[in-house]
Amino acid sequence: MKLMCVLIVSVLVLTACQLSTADDTRDKQKDRLVRLFRKKRDSSDSGLLPRTCVMFGSMCDKEEHSICCYECDYKKGICV
């Protein structure tokens, strides 16, 4: 009986610890994955060229695959 109580209490404590740390790291984990992907993409041995974005007001086009820093208005053909 004592062993069962100790087991239940320990499971509850571990669950509470996981829930409290999960809230703190929710956004940080996403940023870590983004940084890891960018680091891999921009490394010299990846075989990929680093992407540069086109600034606001510059021309963008679907066919040329221009990459705007924010968003491309394809109707007007400019980065917004």
Swiss-Prot record:
Pfam families assigned: Conotoxin (PF02950)
Cystine pairs annotated here are: C53-C69, C60-C72, C68-C79
What InterPro entries does the record tag this protein with?
Conotoxin
Cleavable signal peptide = 1-22
Q: Which domain of life is it from?
A: Eukaryota
Q: Which UniProt keywords apply?
A: Disulfide bond, Ion channel impairing toxin, Knottin, Neurotoxin, Secreted, Signal, Toxin
Question: Where does tissue-level expression of this protein occur?
Answer: Expressed by the venom duct.
Where it mainly occurs, coarsely classed, is: secreted
Query: Where does the record say this protein resides?
Result: Secreted
GO-annotated cellular components: extracellular region
Q: Which residues cross the membrane?
A: none
Single GO molecular-function term?
ion channel inhibitor activity
Secreted recorded as keyword: yes
Positions annotated as propeptide: 23-51
Which family is this protein grouped under? Belongs to the conotoxin O1 superfamily.
Cite the domain annotation text.
The presence of a 'disulfide through disulfide knot' structurally defines this protein as a knottin.
Q: What is this protein called?
A: Conotoxin Bu3
